[in-house]
Amino acid sequence: MENEMSQNGSDRDPWSKPGQSNDQQPGNSSNNNGWNNNQNRGNQEQSPPDIEEIFNNLLKKLGGGNKKSGQNNGSSQGNTPFHFGKVIPLAVAIGAIIWGVNGFYTIKEAERGVVLRFGELHSIVQPGLNWKPTFVDKVLPVNVEQVKELRTQGAMLTQDENMVKVEMTVQYRVQDPAKYLFSVTNADDSLNQATDSALRYVIGHMSMNDILTTGRSVVRENTWKALNEIIKSYDMGLEVIDVNFQSARPPEEVKDAFDDAIKAQEDEQRFIREAEAYAREKEPIARGDAQRILEEATAYKDRIVLDAKGEVERLQRLLPEFKAAPDLLRERLYIQTMEKVMANTPKVMLDGNNGNNLTVLPLEQIMGKKSVTSAPSAVNSSPAFTAPERQNSYQPQPTTVAPIRQGRFN
């Protein structure tokens, strides 16, 4: 029975090495060595990896364990000590390098960095490469060059108790990053509410007709001024760049009437512009005519003055002759005056020695010749005098009429 148990291998020491029995003597061979070797190789292939051995090998590579001489591999791996004094400095050095590298950051050109140290405002950093202690500082980048735009709209009550729908946009940008982040909870939302409040205040102090027609620029300027006064008290770090009054619409019930009123005002402005253009066109012409008349008047004045001076000079030259022969000079002046007066006047020459008592003047010929030589505007429409015909048989002798002569008397 014992022999059978020995052959089956049931009496082996369970703590011995695989393939070695308790009764095996050195130098003795067993009949079942080949079977035991095959069985041992199968057990080694099916057993899980040794976790302790893997951990000890890792410690050896890190320098935490030393191999003892004169011992087997299994016993040396199980008894290797763990040296924390060498592992901790290495881990601290690696962690410090990672911590330092992780602290580098970059701020863009259009941004400013707000540094918080343990949650408290510390400083403002400029664009470029910067460094912060990780887990100590926190950096919040804020764009200070971007122009932002917000839009507000709604139905508002005017001064004359009418409703009007208005729309306005505000362009702004960040001026102080720290105040923008920490002065109020939300600076953008606060600006939106301030814009709505300023717009309602301005609309409430204007009539609906002014808002829809000529008061658009007034609404824009007053809203901008009121908005700056509101945000100044909050000190939000924002700068309002521009305010644009987009549109204003009346309620749908009265929209047609307001459209007609606006069209009439536009026509009025158009007529005014056309009248101003006509005035600008005619004004230079009128100024030119006025200048021409002034120059003609000046020339006429100079001519009259010169003529008068010449006449005075002529009379002064005749004065010695008048003193020497007054009668002769008087007759000469009379003749010259009559020449001027009678030069363009029709004349009839009569013979005074004729004893005929009846003299018939050819008035029709005289008047006809005068109408031909006179200007068309002269009053010449009166009928010529016709001598009444005599009823008696008296035949007058033909009258000799001297030819008409113009010019100087002989």
UniProtKB/Swiss-Prot annotation:
Gene Ontology terms: cellular component: membrane
Cellular location(s): Membrane
Native organism: Haemophilus influenzae (strain ATCC 51907 / DSM 11121 / KW20 / Rd)
PANTHER family: MODULATOR OF FTSH PROTEASE HFLK, STOMATIN-LIKE PROTEIN 2, MITOCHONDRIAL
Pfam family of the protein (one): Band_7
Role played: HflC and HflK could encode or regulate a protease.
Family membership noted in the UniProt record: Belongs to the band 7/mec-2 family. HflK subfamily.
Bias type Low complexity, positions: 19-47
Region of interest called Disordered, as start-end residue ranges on this chain: 1-49, 374-410
Subunit structure: HflC and HflK may interact to form a multimeric complex.
Bias (Polar residues) ranges: 374-400
InterPro entries with a match to the protein in the record: Band7/mec-2_domain, Band_7, Band_7/SPFH_dom_sf, HflK, Stomatin_HflK_fam
Keywords: Membrane, Transmembrane, Transmembrane helix
Lipid bilayer topology: Single-pass membrane protein
Name by which UniProt lists this protein: Protein HflK
